């Protein structure tokens, strides 16, 4: 009798099992830095406010194309994905309720000549796909901006559909 294929086993894993296999522990919801809430649920959609990149609990500052390269920006976007999932879990109680990551919007603090915002944002998109499987495939926008609050290098917001 043949063993299930790796692709089948991957589909059979729960979101929490995937997080555990990746060594990811989701953080608590960060306290907003201004007059807004971390998330809003409207019907079966959850809108998660922009999360900035953090390192060691402090804003991960820098500008892509000046003092940060694409690979480092991608790491920052991946770190944001972990924070976004922590907020999403707080919003719905269990990530198994997520039926689809609908949209990701990324703002990349970058110099005028930096053109790899899409590659930076892949740090978030790739992790969401790894954790949620097919449900993690999403629409996306990635923008280069002159500055982000607190000097952060990347800010990302997310919309998810939940059961």
Identify the function of each model-found stretch.
Residues 13-163:
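Short, polar/acidic, helix-capping and beta-turn segments at strand->helix junctions
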Residues 1-12:
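Short, Lys/Arg-enriched N-terminal segments with co-localized hydrophobic residues
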């Amino acid at each position: 009798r043949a063993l299930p294929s790796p692709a089948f086993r991957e589909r059979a894993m729960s979101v929490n099992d995937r997080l555990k296999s990746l060594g990811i522990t989701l953080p608590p919801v960060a306290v907003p830095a201004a007059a807004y809430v971390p998330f809003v649920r409207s019907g079966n959609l959850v809108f998660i406010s922009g999360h900035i990149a953090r390192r060691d609990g402090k804003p991960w500052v820098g500008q892509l194309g000046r003092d940060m390269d694409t690979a480092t920006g991608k790491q920052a976007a991946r770190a944001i994905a972990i924070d976004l999932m922590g907020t999403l879990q707080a919003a719905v109680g269990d990530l198994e309720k997520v039926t689809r990551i609908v949209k990701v919007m990324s703002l990349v603090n970058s110099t005028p000549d930096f053109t790899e915002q899409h590659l930076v944002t892949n740090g978030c998109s790739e992790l969401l796909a790894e954790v949620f499987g097919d449900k993690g495939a999403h629409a996306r926008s990635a923008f280069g901006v002159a500055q982000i609050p607190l000097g952060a290098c990347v800010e990302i917001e997310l919309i998810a559909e939940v059961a």
